[in-house]
């Protein structure tokens, strides 16, 4: 007989997650106070588009797949431990879902910086069944995932006091191996990246992850990570005027997919030619291609989050559907993966 979890705690957990502000922890980034578990991460916009949520429930995590249209709960599962959807930048951008919709990654929420170990859980995004539990020695956050979910990219914080010092490392999901060699721009001439990740956007095919960094007091730059080729480029944004509030800047890709647009709340500031990586001052830029893969927290908490709560309450009252309660005992584990090339 399949074990089940009482639905009243699930309902209450969802209610709290939807109505209260984000809890005082982060989902991997090196500061506290950012948690996108209740806002989730969305699949590419199509007829089967779904949003994935992770909600705390009494020492466990309820992970859900919710239809973008209509808000129906398509699948949900109860997992032991506390995990959440990873944020990849301080603008609240969410990550962890492969572009082909097959793989979802959750991360253990951060309660302090630095942390001695980092746990992440790789799930089948359809069944929400765990595929691999990854335990890494050291402080890591999630950065990106390749389109098929075969490669993960982690930010490894190398200083116990300065979260702007880090390396980007690749993780082979099939082999359970963290590659020792960091991913760097071959043209960087030994200069190490530093900075806070302020904003993120992805290419339409999910291959390229573009992250805006503040440069830690130096020149702001965009980190362009090729998640298929396991390579990267650092694009200096020298054209940003002195005194610009970098934390208000956002990234978008234009309609034809050829230019990355750096914009503030009022207008485009710079553009980057994605073929040549040349930076230019922005002129008239078409509207961004498609919608962002994350929603503002306030919008979701006030609208779609309440919709999830209502759906959960109906399920609770009818008691017809119960989530699968999963143990991680039989899940493939990776603990301190062997480094390799």
Residue ranges and their predicted role:
Residues 322-341:
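Cytoplasmic C-terminal tails of single-pass
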Residues 48-50, 100-102, 148-150, 205-207, ...:
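Short coil/turn segments that connect the beta-strands within blades of beta-propeller domains
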Residues 306-320:
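Alpha-helical transmembrane segments
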Residues 68-70, 124-128, 173-176, 226-230, ...:
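Short loop/turn segments that connect beta-strands within beta-propeller blades
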Residues 53-54, 106, 154-155, 211, ...:
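Residue position within the beta-strands of beta-propeller blades
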Residues 28-35, 72-87, 129-135, 177-191, ...:
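A short beta-strand motif characteristic of beta-propeller blades
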Residues 33-45, 83-96, 138-147, 188-201, ...:
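Repeated scaffold domains used in trafficking and secretory/extracellular systems
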């Amino acid at each position: 007989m399949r074990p089940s979890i009482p639905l009243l705690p699930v309902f209450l957990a969802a209610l709290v997650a939807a109505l209260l502000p984000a809890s005082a922890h982060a989902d991997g980034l090196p500061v506290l106070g950012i948690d996108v578990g209740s806002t989730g991460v969305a699949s590419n916009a199509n007829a089967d588009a779904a949003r994935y949520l992770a909600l705390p429930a009494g020492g466990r995590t309820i992970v859900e797949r919710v239809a973008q249209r209509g808000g129906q709960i398509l699948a949900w599962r109860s997992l032991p431990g506390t995990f959440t959807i990873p944020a990849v930048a301080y603008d609240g951008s969410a990550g962890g879902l492969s572009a082909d919709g097959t793989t979802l990654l959750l991360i253990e929420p951060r309660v302090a910086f630095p942390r001695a170990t980092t746990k992440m859980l790789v799930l089948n995004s359809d069944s929400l069944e765990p595929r691999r539990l990854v335990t890494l020695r050291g402080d890591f956050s999630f950065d990106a995932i390749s389109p098929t979910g075969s490669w993960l990219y982690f930010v490894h914080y190398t200083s116990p006091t300065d979260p702007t010092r880090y390396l980007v490392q690749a993780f082979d999901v099939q082999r359970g191996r963290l590659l020792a060699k960091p991913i760097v721009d071959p043209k960087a001439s030994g200069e190490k990246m530093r900075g806070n990740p302020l904003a993120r956007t992805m290419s339409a095919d999910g291959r390229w992850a573009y992250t805006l960094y503040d440069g830690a007091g130096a020149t702001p730059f965009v980190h362009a990570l090729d998640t298929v080729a396991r390579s990267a480029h650092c694009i200096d944004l020298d054209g940003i005027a002195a005194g610009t509030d970098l934390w208000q800047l956002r990234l978008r890709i234009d309609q034809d997919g050829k230019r990355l647009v750096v914009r503030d709340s009022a207008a485009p500031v710079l553009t980057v030619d994605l073929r040549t990586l040349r930076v230019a001052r922005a002129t008239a830029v078409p509207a961004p291609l498609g919608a962002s893969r994350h929603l503002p927290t306030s919008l979701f908490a006030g609208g779609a989050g309440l919709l999830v709560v209502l759906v959960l309450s109906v399920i609770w009252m009818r008691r017809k559907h119960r989530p699968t309660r999963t143990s991680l005992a039989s899940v493939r584990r990776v603990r301190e993966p062997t480094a390799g090339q």
